[in-house]
Amino acid sequence: MLCCCCSAYKLDELKTYSPAQFAAAIDAVWDNVLALERPEPVKLSTQPAAPAKKNSLLDRILPGIRSEPSHLKVAFVNERTPETSTWTSQHEFGRTQLDQVFAGKVETVAYHGAEPGKNADELVEKAIQDGADMVFTTSPKLVGASLRAALRHPDVRILNCSVDMPYASIRTYYSRVYEAKFITGAIAAAVAREDRVGYVADTPTFGVPANINAFALGARMVNPRVKVSLQWSCLPGDPIQAFQNQGITVISGRDTPTPFRPAREFGTFRISPGGTLMDLASPFWHWGQFYENVVRTVLDGGWTRDKSGTDGTAVNYWWGMNSGVMDVLLSRELPHDVRHLANILRSGIIAGSIDPFACYITAQNGTVMNEGRTGFTPEQILHMDWLCDAVEGHLPEFDELMDCARPMYRMQGIHRDRLPAEKEADL
C-alpha cells in the first residue's frame, strides 16, 4: 500500500502529513491498491465502445436522466513541442480534429513542454484549473503527474498515452502497432534482394516484442528463408551503420522521425548502393480518430461502459486497425504488386480474417509457442517477452540499457517487476 501511495505522492510530501491527511491519501489511492492486488490488474479495451442507445424507455419516462455533458473542455499536455517532436505534432493533429468534428461542443487547449520531475505536475494542474473536464497526457513519462492529478480531482477524466499501467484512477491508451508491423515485414521481405532484413527497436517495453515478432512473421510469410537482424536504439552504437556493415539494405527504423536522425530513416526503407534512402512504408497513428471516439463516448453518456467499475481494474484502450486508429502509409515508390499485397493484408486484418499470430510459431530457444490452430489473447500479445526463431538478436535487460532508456523501462519494461524499487518511488 505504501508503494502505491509513494507512486501517487512525493515521499517528502507524505512525511509532512498528519494522521488524518495520511488516511485521506490512502483513501484516495484505494482503488489503485485494489487493482494491484488483482491477478489481472489491467483490463484491455480492444474495441471502441458501442454508441449509446437513444430513445430508450428510460429516456422517455425520465428525460434528462442521462449524464451527457453539453460541452467539454479537453486539454492536451505534451512532454515536448510540435516543432521538436513528430510524436507531439501527430497528437496536435488529433486535437485539431476534435475542434473540427465537435465545433461548438468541444473546446481544446494544448500545453507543451511538460517535464517529469520539473513542471509536469504544474502543467496538468494548470489545465484543470483552466477548466478542463478531460485531460490527455501524451507521453508515458507523464503517467505520474496524471495519477497525482486524478487523485486530487476525481471528477476530471484523465488519460495517459501508455500501456499496462495498473492505476484505476486514470485510463491509458495506445494502439496495436504489431498489426502494422506485420504488413511492413511482408513489404520488407518482398523488396529485399537478400534473405536478411534489419529491424531497429527502441526499448524492450510492453508490446515491443510483439511488434518485432509480427514484423518477422510477415517477412517470413513472403520469404520463408528470411532472417530479421535486430538492433536496439537503447544500446550503444549506430544500428543503421551496423546493418550496412552486414550488407543489409532493407531496414525497419524508428516509427517516427526525430531531430537526431535524418527524416527518411524512419518506417521501413531501403538503402541503395549509393547510399540513397527510399521510403517503403511506415506505421501511422490516426490519433484524431481515437480522440474523436473517446470524446464522443463522453458526450453520449457512455464513458462508464468502458470502465470496469465494480471490479476496480485499470482500463487500457488498445485499439487496432479495425478502429481506424492504426494504419500503414505506403510509399508512392512501392512496386505495384507489393502495394497490392499490403492492401490485401490490411483488408484482412481490418476484417478479422488475418491474424498475424494465428500460425505455427517457434521461439529462438526452440519452444513451440503456437501450433497454429488459434491466435494469442490480447494480454498474451502485449506481454510477450520472447522472440521467434526468425529473429537474430536478443531482448536486452535493464543493466544493458543506456541511462536515457532506463526510466522508460522502469515504467513499462517487459521485466519491470524484477527490478528493485528505487529509493524515491516518485514516477
Language model region names:
Residues 12-427:
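A residue-level marker of the well-folded mature domains of exported/periplasmic proteins
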Residues 2-12:
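Short helix/strand-capping connector loops at secondary-structure junctions
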